[in-house]
């Protein structure tokens, strides 16, 4: 994940220069994590209030003009109602959404497919150079699946 930080910093600059609205989803787990389905299968991570829960300092997202941080307790953010949740009126055919982040094979793919399900006419792009998977093989497999689900994947190196 550390290897993508320079690319993500550049992407944030691009978003800022374009005046884009940025939504950051943030894994947020609590003391009961080990008792959850996810917690029984994955090691403890992103525990609320710890350094591992924070967005890394190198990504100065607060410099973005328009952003929102949405905490999520599992792989995907489950409230992608643009108008109700974010106060953004939309015509789904006009939505142009780019997704970046970690973990490609868990969180990125889940959110991409959720958004595609809610908004099938939206243009959804995943920038592979700004994503990291749990392994290189799973990263590639997730990108392949997203492409097969009509999600545009760019910068596959």
Task: For the regions a language model picked out, list residue spans one by one.
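Von Willebrand factor
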Residues: 14-32
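Active-site-adjacent betaalpha module
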Residues: 7-20, 43-157
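Metal-dependent catalytic neighborhoods of phosphoester/phosphodiester hydrolases
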Residues: 32-38
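Short glycine-enriched, charge-decorated loop/helix-capping segments at active-site entrances
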Residues: 1-3, 39-46
């Amino acid at each position: 994940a550390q290897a993508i930080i320079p690319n993500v910093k550049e992407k944030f600059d691009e978003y800022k220069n374009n005046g884009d609205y940025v939504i950051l989803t943030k894994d947020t787990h609590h003391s009961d994590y080990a008792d959850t389905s996810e917690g029984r299968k994955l090691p403890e991570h992103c525990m609320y209030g710890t350094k591992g829960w924070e967005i890394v300092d190198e990504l100065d997202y607060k410099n973005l003009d328009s952003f929102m941080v949405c905490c999520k307790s599992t792989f995907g953010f489950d409230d992608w109602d643009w108008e109700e949740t974010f106060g953004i009126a939309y015509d789904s055919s006009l939505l142009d959404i780019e997704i970046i982040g970690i973990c490609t094979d868990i969180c990125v793919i889940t959110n991409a497919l959720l958004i595609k399900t809610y908004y099938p006419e939206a243009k959804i792009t995943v920038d592979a150079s700004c994503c990291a998977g749990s392994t290189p093989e799973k990263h590639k497999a997730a990108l392949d699946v997203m492409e097969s689900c009509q999600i545009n994947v760019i910068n596959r190196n």
